[in-house]
């Protein structure tokens, strides 16, 4: 059983907590980054384009472990920016991907830098493997 918990103020498109029954198979995914198949940064200087690539890569990670966006329980979304408008633009990409339709809880963070030169977005995820 997986359920969405929304006991606090109404969350925009995520849950305040996710509950998973013991014995459920989980996948803990490393950060999805905006690299193409050749290992090059996609959308240099463009956090929205990078978020799109990150979501595409996240879907591939999920597929590889036998899961999908509907089974994501938790994400942490890292954006190299101190501007809430930039964080919101990246979050809109996350919402548009369909990720927010599941029981997932999320944290959206503005950070100083990420691991690759030119990288502006990274998303880590935990998902149920049905």
Say what each PLM segment does:
Residues 1-130:
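Short, polar/acidic, helix-capping and beta-turn segments at strand->helix junctions
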